[in-house]
Amino acid sequence: MLLVDTSVWVNHLRKGEPRLQQALMDDQILMHPFVLGEIACGTLHRRSSILNDLAQLPHAVSAEHDEVLAFLEQHRLYGKGIGWIDAHLLASAALTPCRLWTLDSRLGDAAASLKLGTNN
């Protein structure tokens, strides 16, 4: 299973991402509420339809904020250039468990260091 970061979704919605399309057809994609929220903040063609479709995807386990703080400390993820939502996605991938697919290099490096990346 793959938890897909906003960067991958944005790329898919703009240009199409054949690997994501195939993974969707194979029921291999998980959604996170923060990713859905980030996508909802943008301008979307067929907005209602896209947001509804994304909301219907299976959801990864969401970590509580205190769990994410502990996760940051335990894995020494501070000072790595990732943000709070990134930290939530990493914790979520670890809890689910699943792989995290991102186009963001810093988030990808953090995922790889935790053996949660798509290239591991």
Please provide the spans of the model-predicted regions.
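Short, well-structured N-terminal submotif of metal-dependent ribonuclease cores
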Residues: M1-V35, A40-N52, N119
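Active-site neighborhoods of divalent-metal-dependent phosphate/nucleic-acid chemistry enzymes
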Residues: H12, P18, H59-N120
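Conserved nucleotide-sugar phosphate-binding/catalytic loop shared by glycosyltransferases and other
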Residues: Q56
